[in-house]
Amino acid sequence: MPRTILVVLSEWGFWGEELVGPLESFDAAGYHVDFATPTGKRPVALSPSMDPTYVDPPLGRAVVAQEMAEKVKAIDDPQNPRLNQPKNLKAWLPERPYWSSPKFIREMEAYYKQLDTVREQDLQHYDALLIVGGSGPIVDLVNNQRVHDLILSFRQMGKPVAAECYGVACLAFARDLGDRKSILWGK
C-alpha cells in the first residue's frame, strides 16, 4: 500500500509552486496524496503564481518561471479533476466548544472523544501533513482550530508536519490547550 500524504490548502488561494513542487516529488516517490480544505471547496491557485511576468514587489523581479506557470495552470484548470472533492475539514473534525458554554465540560469531553476517533480511524492512515502557503492561508487556515487539531494530532502521532510560506503561521498558532504555548515555542 502506498504511503499517503494529507495536503491542506486554502480556499482563498494557494501559491502554485508551493503545491506543484512537493506534488511532483510525492508523485515521483509513489506517494498517494489526499487534499483537504476548510469547507471542502475546490482550492484555486493565486493568479500571480501562474503569471511569469508577475514582479514580486519586495524582490523587484519576476518570481514565476514559464514552465512552473504552465504546471500551475494545468493543476488549477477546473477540467483537471486532481483537486476536485477535497476533504472537508469542517465536516471531518469536531468543533472545539466555547469556553463560555454552560455545558463546557461535557462538550469538551465529547470533542476530545470525537477527535480521538478521527485520529484513530482516519489520521493513522496518513504518513505526513503538508500545509501549502500563499496569501490564502492567512484568511482561512491560520486561525482555524481544525487545522490546529490536525497539526497537533500528527505531532502527537510522531508524524512529520511541514508548512510552506504563510502556511507556517498555522504552526505558530497550533497550541496545546494544556500549556497554551505554540508548538514552535523555544525553537
Task: Specify the residue positions occupied by each region the protein language model found.
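Short, thiol/selenol-centered motifs that function as redox-active sites or metal-ligating centers
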Residues: 164-169
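Active-site cofactor/cluster-binding pocket
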Residues: 160
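Extended, subdomain-level signal for the structured scaffold at the beginning of enzyme domains
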Residues: 1-157, 170-187
